Amino acid sequence: YETAADVVVIEPGKDLQVDLENLEKALINHKDRRLKIGSFTACSNVTGVRTPYHAMARLMHEHGGVAFIDFAASAPYEAINMHPENPMEKLDAVMFSPHKFLGGPGSSGVLIFDSSLYHSKVPDQPGGGTVDWTNAWGEYKFIDNIEIREDGGTPGFLQAIKTALAIELKNQMNTEMMHEREKELVALAFRKLKKIKGIHILAENITDRLGIISFYADSIHYNMFVRLLSDRFGVQVRGGCACAGTYGHYLLNVSHDKSKRITDKINLGDLSEKPGWVRLSLHPTMKDKELRFILDAIEEIVKYHPVWKDDYIYDKHTNEFRHKLGTTHNGRIDSWFKLT
């Protein structure tokens, strides 16, 4: 919807997982389209559930399309293979955000694509260092090298260095070892959360996932839950729909009519009925005792929420909760920004 493309959502199959038959049906229905781009996520940033992206790429290629895979959620923990043994399963483009890697904040985004896809004669963002020459009569020639031509202005040297270091750290940690550790953490979290009355895990039937667990609680607003975890226990999690509003309609079984009622209110500035959840991210470096502390905190919030919630005021325009005493900080923070 952000481009000139017609977006086709592939309906999920059983248990909301990828249905390759539905993908093929969509490709057949659009066989007359000259350009067919399969833009898929490698892993959900809401449930941690992986997708069969190589099989999806094969279907795209069999029907004359290309496959672009978003590894934002899984790149810090999983290997990325753009050229598997079967050439029909190759990935035409991948993208990921190194700032999600351990040690990655401050790095730049990464896009890797098959150069045969590039046909533009003018860079997306013209700037310094993108031309071989110019003259006094308005003539010029852009640099042939795609990477240089598309990197106008001063390159992000520090960002690139940090990206490389974060990837190297990932390689040293070993993806197989990280996977094994995440399995242990996910199992521990599932055992505890399933015992807490009123807690509902999204896609709880799938335990083979990355260390991403999203849940909601009966009668507790997700942003209230987030605020209490932070204020009472010093634990930071994310509340909302995690940039996955469309997926959220399936996860929370939101009908078109209900969605319309909610979005109409949002358009009027009232976010009070906007659906969402609490996302807990488990990292391979976490210790068991750290995770147990978080899980115990979740249980405490469920138990004492009826009392603790009275300390907060809800703003329907921001969908946030603020403490009645206001937000305060000690003077030490101010000193960070003083030059003398």
Task: Briefly describe each language-model feature range.
Residues Y1-T340:
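Pyridoxal 5′-phosphate
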